[in-house]
Amino acid sequence: MPGGVYGHQNGAALGDGHPRFLARAERARIWDVDGNEYVDWMCAYGPMLLGYGHPAVEAAVAEQLASGDCLPLPGPRMVELAERLVSLTPRADFAVFGKNGADATSWAVDVARAHTGRPLIVRARGAYHAARPWSLPGLPGVPAHYREELLEFAWNDLDELRALFTGHGERIAVVITTPFDHVTGAGPAPGFFEGLRALCDTHGAVFAMDDVRAGFRFHLGGSGEHFGAAPDLICYSKAIANGHALAAGLGREPLRRAAERVYFTGSFFFASGAFAAALATLDVLEQTDAIARIQRTGRALTDGLAEQARGHGVPLLPVGQPAMPVIRFADDPERRRIRRWCSLVTEGGAYAHPAHNWFVSAAHTDEDVARTLEATERAFKTVATEG
């Protein structure tokens, strides 16, 4: 394999304390190939929401697989899930399905371009929306014209966004954002999403919400409902099926014709096992306090980290959203100190990432938080001593 290990977050680039391969997982714990156990605060980079191997989800998948999975035509589970998502999401009238977050966000860009007849994409500076050329135009192998089709503004800066519309409004197809800042986790400033919505309406552009990472950790109807956003298109993946491969794109009625015109397909898009997993996941979310529990656990974790950092004089920056905290230190531009700290935390039994937001799940317990805070306390003490 190129580089030995590949992926959007190469494990080989992490600190010495991090494992390179994992053998199994259960609830909120993971075990590496050497048998070491960790509390997992990455949740498979987001897809794990209810716990690894959740019995209700896995039972639904097993029942579906007994009847068939990837077939030449879709099954009834696809229709059931589309109807369910539309019923749960106040600003959605239709749904389509893919496999990865990039499927959903790229579909949204295509729909917006088809609807408006325009080429330009606007996003917040530093945001990541897909491992696709339109989102990562500066990477090797990507033609230069992709860079010319992407405009950026600073998160929460309506003046800069307004200036982009003033200069390029007739060519802007879509503004795509996450529900909070991708880099810092900072939430929207008062009036930000209302202003963004008004600019899109004034200039005839589409507002797409990339809810791939955050979806279902804040609100059953989409993170926009929690943060006060009113998008035209919504993109889900990761947690929607508790670890089974699925993505969804939801849209408002005025964009239905454009959605009918774009070409959106894939070899495994009809696989019904993932639809069954998503339906079961939504059942659990509706029937329990899972989302509220995620928020409570995230606050307990991040409050504990903040108290420890203060006690040891380590300058912990604001973590953003407790359910998806961004752990960073001030005066650490090359991330050396945070990498050292995360390696120590991981060695202590809690899997911690130095360059990606963490994720909290409904499976994390008070015991998991306590075990983690024991590891982080020791790590803070060490990095404070090392300076």
Predicted regions and their residues:
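Conserved N-terminal phosphate-binding loop of PLP-dependent enzymes in the Aspartate aminotransferase
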Residues: 1-387
